Curated annotation (Swiss-Prot):
A Pfam family reported for this protein in Swiss-Prot or TrEMBL: Monellin
Biotech utility: Natural monellin has not been mass marketed to the food industry, primarily due to the challenge of large-scale purification of the protein which is relatively sensitive to heat or acid treatment.
Cited InterPro entries: Cystatin_sf, Monellin, Monellin_B, Sweet-Taste_Mod_sf
Organism: Dioscoreophyllum cumminsii (Serendipity berry)
Protein name: Monellin chain B
Complex and partners: Heterodimer of an A chain and a B chain.
Record has Ion transport as a keyword: no
Lineage of producing organism: Eukaryota, Viridiplantae, Streptophyta, Embryophyta, Tracheophyta
Entry superkingdom: Eukaryota
Amino acid sequence: GEWEIIDIGPFTQNLGKFAVDEENKIGQYGRLTFNKVIRPCMKKTIYEEN
């Protein structure tokens, strides 16, 4: 899938913007790996630290 840079609010201040693969619903930035697509309109910010 295509990679889209999205803003995840408060986290952006510390971690910057995240690249999210819309097709696979997984994004990676630094040491964070997301198991859900995170959008500004979402309240859920589920992630796992490697």
